[in-house]
């Protein structure tokens, strides 16, 4: 009997592969899309800036004028004590939240909603931003960091500016232990060992006097879980 593959262990859901969500500061999303934001604006004050484990960007605790508190992603240049505005009549300034339809073309935005009121789904990593490309009747086109242009409802909210925490990838990890701790906060198993580098007991591609597959890489979709590695139910393999 061989040992279980990493995909089988992950499916079992042991602590190694389970996201440590109990360490999170809380949900990071916009306040509910109420009449106060639809008709005007509401002011909020940044009372604290926090580090959220497993998140690449810092988060801010914002207290609004109605004493409601929220965790939000902050842009570069915001500090404790500054005020932000949320609503259709908010000023075009980094940190302010407006519907996409009210943001001029060419302005960088982040934490974009895909459905009005969902709290923000797109462009949330540190240092990321998207651009408002154009407006049309009933739609706004936004260019995402990947280069893909997405058509969205103009009522979807977004934050003006660039997410704080940019440049994080420029500093090397240097030590393997630092990378291990960084990725363990996101429940990512690291390092990732190749199957051909394993022993025969650990992987179907393991063993042998040199590193090679030793068998076809294509497998049936209905094969047993312990053998389901490589190109699963592939129509074709190799270069085109």
Swiss-Prot record:
GO MF assignments: rRNA binding; structural constituent of ribosome
UniProt GO BP: cytoplasmic translation
Compositionally biased intervals (Polar residues): 1-11
Signal peptide: none
Keyword list, A-Z: Ribonucleoprotein, Ribosomal protein, RNA-binding, rRNA-binding
Bias (Basic residues) ranges: 13-28, 224-240
Superkingdom as given in the UniProt entry: Archaea
Region annotation (Disordered) ranges: 1-31, 206-240
Gene3D superfamilies: 2.30.30.30, Nucleic acid-binding proteins, Ribosomal protein L2, domain 3
GO cellular component, one term: cytosolic large ribosomal subunit
Keyword Ribonucleoprotein recorded: yes
Subunit structure of this chain's protein: Part of the 50S ribosomal subunit. Forms a bridge to the 30S subunit in the 70S ribosome.
Sequence similarity: Belongs to the universal ribosomal protein uL2 family.
Role noted for this protein: One of the primary rRNA binding proteins. Required for association of the 30S and 50S subunits to form the 70S ribosome, for tRNA binding and peptide bond formation. It has been suggested to have peptidyltransferase activity; this is somewhat controversial. Makes several contacts with the 16S rRNA in the 70S ribosome.
Name of this protein: Large ribosomal subunit protein uL2
Organism listed in the record: Methanococcus maripaludis (strain C6 / ATCC BAA-1332)
Protein's gene: rpl2
């Amino acid at each position: 009997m061989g040992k279980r593959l990493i995909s089988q262990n992950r499916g079992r859901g042991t602590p190694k592969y389970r996201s440590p969500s109990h360490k999170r500061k809380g949900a990071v999303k916009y306040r509910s899309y109420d009449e106060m934001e639809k008709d005007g604006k509401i002011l909020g004050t940044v009372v604290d800036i926090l580090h959220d484990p497993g998140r690449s960007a810092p988060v801010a605790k914002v207290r609004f004028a109605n004493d409601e508190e929220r965790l939000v992603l902050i842009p570069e240049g915001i500090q404790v004590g500054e005020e932000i505005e949320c609503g259709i009549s908010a000023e075009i300034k980094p940190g302010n939240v407006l519907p996409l339809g009210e943001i001029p073309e060419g302005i960088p935005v982040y934490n974009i909603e895909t459905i009005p009121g969902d709290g923000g789904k797109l462009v949330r990593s540190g240092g990321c931003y998207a651009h408002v490309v154009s407006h049309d009747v009933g739609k706004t086109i936004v260019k995402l960091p990947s280069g893909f242009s997405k058509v969205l409802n103009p009522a979807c909210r977004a934050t003006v500016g660039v997410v704080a925490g940019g440049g994080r990838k420029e500093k090397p990890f240097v030590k393997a232990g630092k990378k291990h701790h960084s990725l363990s906060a996101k429940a990512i198993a690291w390092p990732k060992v190749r199957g051909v580098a394993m022993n025969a007991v650990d992987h179907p591609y393991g063993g042998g006097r040199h590193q090679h597959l030793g068998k076809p890489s294509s497998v049936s979709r209905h094969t047993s879980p312990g053998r389901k590695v490589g190109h699963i139910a592939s129509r074709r393999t190799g270069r085109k």
